[in-house]
């Protein structure tokens, strides 16, 4: 039934053709069940395991690798001789990597879809209904309830469907609907129509929503919606319809994969076409097909060389390390890619209750009467410190602590707070915190009594459990609570009837009253001044109400409660307590004692975090279900708004937002910093608008109502104390529910991205080098310098370790003083592409050069000519060009070993270059990142392992090297450092001046002291002797060029 909240009870019952006392007939139930189905949320049809596995192979890079593995496998199948076993190593290793990646991907996907299933925990199992087949109430399975059913609900029940209340059988009905609306206190319900058809859920005071809990009272109602038509069902549909966005990093890697695949395809085709003339060479037995297959194998090797196989593993490792660091800061990351997304967050949409505030109602101000003279009076105003339920804080007057027992008015005020109260404090030993037992408002009063300690109770030596209610217990020992007159909407107050535990002539029964100031003060005839009772005059009443109005509408927007006493109430037997309409008669002729002002206070550390966000160029938007006045007041206190800032176009209620045109709504999302009284649909709409501006949005939430927006935003952040639905729909969970933790996580995300950029570039330059190497050997007609299994080893192991270590680079000191990076900013800029292309070309040329050196100039090598080397495929005994040359020498493992050793060594030097994007190694020595030094040592040790430990040399088709050969490797490798230092110098001084923190604002002088400033002399002293020794030793290097 649409808009049931706007209809009268009679209209709703008439719509379903049902009587409240008898319920539906079995025939009606059958028809309604056929029409509306079961009252349950349908199970989400998840993807099958096969679908999830296939999905993991949709990535372009993965598909290219898979194709390369399949082709390698087919080629290995037809391999002959000794190479048969080693030929299978390459496809096997590639497939192993792909399977491992797929397993990780499937595991993450499985976790992600739990959010929709978690909604089922809010479905009650049973419900109590009236139906015509039985004369009394009957318990049935909640899934069998249909629209039109008459349902009975009482305290402790979970509401089984969306229900329009028809009658309330207790004084009041309170409902905890925080999971759905985010309201921090339980809501009082009534049966009157709410005429507004566009009312938000918070304002539908005559409706009960499926999955919410009855906090107090008993009532009956008619079911108006079941299953997916309930409010919680609509949230489920919204979550199902929400597609998960790919993170900026995933998008960048997708783009990179596309570009790389095109480049790889072009180079592979080019290599194959260049060598068409060699297809008929004698080495292939004169068979054109054999020659074509041989060069096709080289093209496949090229594809393997060009793809950074280690990149997914290194990225996963780096993100996993980042999650561990975040976990130490109380941010538990559920989705690895979201770690990096945090780094480019430009908007944080934060819930108010529990995130920006403590969600622990706290009395912060109170007043009692000091003096009264006719129509004028003066007040004693007090402030109270402490912003949690912990009974720690003090009462201050004019910023100085006071002893409360010195004020009679405060003693009576504390007595009312303790006795007119059904809540208590409890110390949770497991969590180590004080928690509320009962209502938030009443717990705040209990905590206030503990801070006041009006009877000067000795508190030292008490355990934390005993301390929780020590002062309240002293007051409760003095008077006994006989009965309670429950809160009702008409009088807006509640009271308790108390008698002294030790009767005497002076002590007598009293009624203590608390409630909304306008309701209580209108029924006060007197005011308490010290221990005396003075008549209430219009002037005094006006003064009291003006202070209360100021507290309620000022910068604090406090929730005020008036506290009063009835000194001479009727005796219990004279009261008619069966009818709650009589309660107001017994709460008249009251004496006003004082007033307390409370609020859900902002967390202490939030203001500094909001300031840090502003410095970092991140906009903070508060989105709350609370009312606008309270929301704006908290915004002012934490710095989202300035104290006197005009919030006309910067703060909206859900209703005001709905009334705007679509273009005005877009503009509102661009400028607003506060949305109050909102529903789940508003949150999702706000996220959509922000995403249309290319903003990267982090959304916080804890309730079921937050789940769709958490899932839709780039970063969904759930509270540790939140619902299971919110947690499973989000990428990150805050263990301490603290906004400041988000800011710390953003900082960590930025540092991770910077480091990730370094190792991605490092791996790419390595792959460029491998591609250039294979392309050069094919173009020059040289024997293979590197084979696929060697390239896999380099890409996965020897490159992977330093790349992972680069994730430990220390973050920049000014990382939170820069605006968020543009998510569309390329991973590699034009200059950096040129830089790494230049380095890559040197890596490739050096690798080919090392292999050529062994053939042409090395002692112990064949010393063939360049022509013979470039036409080695024509080598046979009867060819005069190869007279005296043993053709088997062209299959020697030495040149491959030289090429592989140069490639590994040069990559270690390149890792040192990647320590900083633009800073010189002379100023930032390797030990700035000790993990990098360790990983380089480990990579070189692994290289020695495959060189010198049998049978590894056989698998990798390499052989041990002697000292001269190692010196040659170093001679060829070390210049890459000089080359990158030159490119860094150009970047620092001509292309990106001022980007480095160390860069001086003025042009540096050319004096020797200025040039040597900041140089790490220990590094210079360490490296210089090595360089001199390497380059002073003769290795026949020049013979290669003069032969």
Curated annotation (Swiss-Prot):
Note down the stretches annotated as region Interaction with PLN. Answer: 787-807, 931-942
Q: Does the keyword Calcium apply?
A: yes
User: Which residues, renumbered to this chain, carry the PTM 3'-nitrotyrosine?
Assistant: 294-295
Q: What is the topology of this protein in the membrane according to its UniProt annotation?
A: Multi-pass membrane protein
> Does this entry carry the keyword Repressor?
no
Binding of Ca(2+) 1, residues: 304-305, 307, 309, 795, 799
Q: Which GO terms describe its biological process?
A: autophagosome assembly; autophagosome membrane docking; calcium ion import into sarcoplasmic reticulum; calcium ion transmembrane transport; calcium ion transport; calcium ion transport from cytosol to endoplasmic reticulum; cardiac muscle hypertrophy in response to stress; cellular response to heat
Q: Which residues carry this modification: Phosphoserine?
A: 38, 531, 580, 661, 663
Q: Write out the transmembrane intervals.
A: 49-69, 90-110, 254-273, 296-313, 757-776, 787-807, 828-850, 897-916, 930-948, 964-984
Leader sequence residues: none
Give one Pfam family. Cation_ATPase_C
Output the SUPFAM superfamilies linked to this UniProt entry: Calcium ATPase, transduction domain A, Calcium ATPase, transmembrane domain M, HAD-like, Metal cation-transporting ATPase, ATP-binding domain N
Arranged from A to Z, the UniProt key words for this protein are: ATP-binding, Calcium, Calcium transport, Disulfide bond, Endoplasmic reticulum, Ion transport, Magnesium, Membrane, Metal-binding, Nitration, Nucleotide-binding, Phosphoprotein, Sarcoplasmic reticulum, Translocase, Transmembrane, Transmembrane helix, Transport
Describe regulators of its activity. Has different conformational states with differential Ca2+ affinity. The E1 conformational state (active form) shows high Ca(2+) affinity, while the E2 state exhibits low Ca(2+) affinity. Binding of ATP allosterically increases its affinity for subsequent binding of Ca2+. Reversibly inhibited by phospholamban (PLN) at low calcium concentrations. PLN inhibits ATP2A2 Ca(2+) affinity by disrupting its allosteric activation by ATP. Inhibited by sarcolipin (SLN) and myoregulin (MRLN). The inhibition is blocked by VMP1.
Name the active site residues: 351 (4-aspartylphosphate intermediate)
- Lumenal face of the membrane: 70-89, 274-295, 777-786, 851-896, 949-963
Query: For ATP, which residues are the binding ones?
Result: 353, 442, 489, 514, 559, 624-626, 677, 683, 705
Query: What's a single GO MF annotation on this record?
Result: calcium ion binding
Quaternary state and partners of this protein? Interacts with sarcolipin (SLN); the interaction inhibits ATP2A2 Ca(2+) affinity. Interacts with phospholamban (PLN); the interaction inhibits ATP2A2 Ca(2+) affinity. Interacts with myoregulin (MRLN). Interacts with ARLN and ERLN; the interactions inhibit ATP2A2 Ca(2+) affinity. Interacts with STRIT1/DWORF; the interaction results in activation of ATP2A2. Interacts with the monomeric forms of SLN, PLN, ARLN, ERLN and STRI1/DWORF. Interacts with HAX1. Interacts with S100A8 and S100A9. Interacts with SLC35G1 and STIM1. Interacts with TMEM203. Interacts with TMEM64 and PDIA3.
Name under which the protein is recorded: Sarcoplasmic/endoplasmic reticulum calcium ATPase 2
């Amino acid at each position: 039934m649409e808009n049931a909240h706007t209809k009268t009870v009679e209209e709703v019952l008439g719509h379903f053709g049902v009587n409240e006392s008898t319920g539906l007939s079995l025939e009606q139930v059958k028809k309604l069940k056929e029409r509306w189905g079961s009252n349950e949320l349908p199970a989400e049809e998840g993807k099958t395991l096969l679908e999830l596995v296939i999905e993991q192979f949709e990535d372009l890079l993965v598909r290219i690798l898979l194709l390369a593995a399949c082709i390698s496998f087919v080629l290995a199948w037809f391999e002959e001789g000794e190479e048969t076993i080693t030929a299978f190593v390459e496809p096997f290793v590639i497939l192993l990597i792909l399977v491992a990646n797929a397993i990780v991907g499937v595991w993450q996907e499985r976790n992600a879809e739990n959010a929709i299933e978690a909604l089922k925990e809010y479905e009650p199992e049973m419900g109590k209904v009236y139906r015509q087949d039985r004369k009394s109430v009957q318990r049935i399975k909640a899934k069998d309830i249909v629209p039109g059913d008459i349902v009975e609900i009482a305290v402790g029940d979970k509401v089984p469907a969306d229900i329009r209340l028809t009658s309330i059988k207790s004084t009041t009905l309170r409902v905890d609907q925080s999971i759905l609306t985010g309201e921090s206190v339980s809501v009082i319900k009534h049966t009157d129509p709410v005429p507004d058809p566009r009312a938000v859920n918070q304002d539908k005071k005559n409706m009960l929503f499926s999955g919410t809990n009855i906090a107090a009272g008993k009532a009956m109602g008619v079911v108006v919606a079941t299953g997916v038509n309930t409010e919680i069902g609509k949230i489920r549909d919204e979550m199902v319809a929400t597609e998960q966005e790919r993170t900026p990093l995933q998008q960048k890697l997708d783009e990179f994969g596309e570009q790389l695949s095109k480049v790889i395809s072009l180079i592979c085709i080019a290599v194959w076409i260049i060598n068409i003339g060699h297809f008929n060479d004698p080495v292939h037995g004169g068979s054109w097909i054999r020659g074509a297959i041989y060069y096709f194998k080289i093209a496949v090797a090229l594809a393997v060389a060009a793809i950074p196989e280690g990149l997914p593993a290194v990225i996963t490792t780096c993100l996993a390390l980042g999650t561990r660091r975040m976990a130490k800061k109380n941010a538990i990351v559920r989705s690895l890619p979201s770690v990096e997304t945090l780094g480019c967050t430009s908007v944080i949409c934060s819930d108010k209750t529990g995130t920006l505030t403590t969600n622990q109602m706290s009395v912060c101000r109170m007043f009692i009467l000091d003096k009264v003279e006719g129509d004028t009076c003066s007040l004693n105003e007090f402030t109270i410190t402490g912003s949690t339920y912990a009974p720690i804080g003090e009462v201050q007057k004019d910023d100085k602590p006071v002893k409360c027992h010195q004020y009679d008015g405060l003693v009576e005020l504390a007595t009312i707070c303790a006795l007119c109260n059904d809540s208590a404090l409890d110390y949770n030993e497991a969590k180590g915190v004080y928690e509320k037992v009962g209502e938030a408002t009443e717990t705040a009063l209990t905590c206030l009594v503990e801070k006041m300690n009006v009877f000067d109770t000795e508190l030292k030596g008490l355990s934390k459990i005993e301390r929780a209610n020590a002062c309240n217990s002293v007051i409760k020992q003095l008077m006994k609570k006989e009965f309670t007159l429950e809160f009702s909407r008409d009088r807006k107050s509640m009271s308790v009837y108390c008698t002294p535990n030790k009767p005497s002539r002076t002590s007598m029964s009293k009624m203590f009253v608390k409630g909304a100031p306008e309701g209580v003060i209108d029924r006060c005839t007197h005011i308490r001044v010290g221990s005396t009772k003075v008549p209430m005059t219009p002037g005094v009443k006006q003064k009291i109400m003006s202070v209360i109005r100021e507290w309620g509408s000022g910068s604090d927007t406090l929730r005020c409660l008036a506290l009063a006493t009835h000194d001479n109430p009727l005796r219990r037997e004279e009261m008619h307590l069966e009818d709650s309409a009589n309660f107001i008669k017994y709460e008249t002729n009251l004496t006003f004692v004082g007033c307390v002002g409370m609020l859900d206070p902002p967390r202490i550390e939030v203001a500094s975090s909001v300031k840090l966000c502003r410095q970092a160029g991140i906009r903070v938007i508060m989105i709350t279900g609370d009312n606008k006045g309270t929301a704006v007041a908290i915004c002012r206190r934490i710095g989202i708004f300035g104290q006197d800032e005009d919030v006309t176009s910067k703060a909206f209620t859900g209703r005001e937002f709905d009334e705007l045109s679509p273009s005005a709504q877009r503009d509102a999302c661009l400028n607003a910093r506060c949305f109050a009284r909102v529903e789940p649909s508003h949150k999702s709409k706000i996220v959509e608008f922000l995403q249309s501006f290319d903003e990267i949005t982090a959304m916080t939430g804890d309730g079921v109502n937050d789940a769709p927006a958490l899932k839709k935003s780039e970063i969904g952040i759930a509270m540790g104390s939140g619902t299971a639905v919110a947690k499973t729909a989000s990428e990150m969970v805050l263990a301490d529910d603290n906004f400041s933790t988000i800011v710390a996580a953003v900082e960590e995300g930025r540092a991770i991205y910077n480091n990730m950029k370094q190792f991605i570039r490092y791996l790419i330059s390595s792959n460029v080098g491998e591609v250039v190497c294979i392309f050069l050997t094919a173009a020059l007609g040289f024997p293979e310098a590197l084979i696929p299994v060697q390239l896999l080893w380099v890409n996965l192991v020897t490159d992977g370790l330093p790349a992972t270590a680069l994730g430990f680079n220390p973050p920049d000191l000014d990382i939170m003083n820069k605006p968020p990076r543009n998510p569309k900013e390329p991973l590699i800029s034009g200059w950096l592409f040129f830089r790494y292309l230049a380095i890559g070309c040197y890596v490739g040329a050096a690798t080919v050069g090392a292999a050529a050196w062994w053939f042409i100039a090395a002692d112990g090598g064949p010393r063939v000519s360049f022509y013979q080397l470039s036409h080695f495929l024509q080598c046979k005994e009867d060819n005069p060009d190869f007279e005296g040359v043993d053709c088997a020498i062209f299959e020697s493992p030495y040149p491959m070993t030289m090429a592989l050793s140069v490639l590994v060594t040069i990559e270690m030097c390149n890792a040192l270059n990647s320590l900083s994007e633009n800073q010189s190694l002379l100023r930032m020595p390797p030990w700035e990142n000790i993990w990098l030094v360790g990983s380089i040592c480990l990579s070189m040790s692994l290289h020695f392992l495959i060189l010198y430990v049998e049978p590894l040399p056989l698998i990798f088709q390499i052989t041990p090297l002697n000292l001269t050969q190692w010196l040659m490797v170093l001679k060829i490798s070390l210049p890459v450092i000089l080359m990158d230092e030159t490119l860094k110098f150009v970047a620092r001084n001509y292309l990106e001046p001022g980007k480095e923190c160390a860069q001086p604002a003025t042009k540096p002088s050319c004096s020797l002291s200025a040039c040597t400033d900041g140089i790490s002399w220990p590094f210079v002293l360490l490296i210089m002797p090595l360089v001199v020794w390497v380059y002073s030793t003769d290795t026949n290097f020049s013979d290669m060029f003069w032969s």
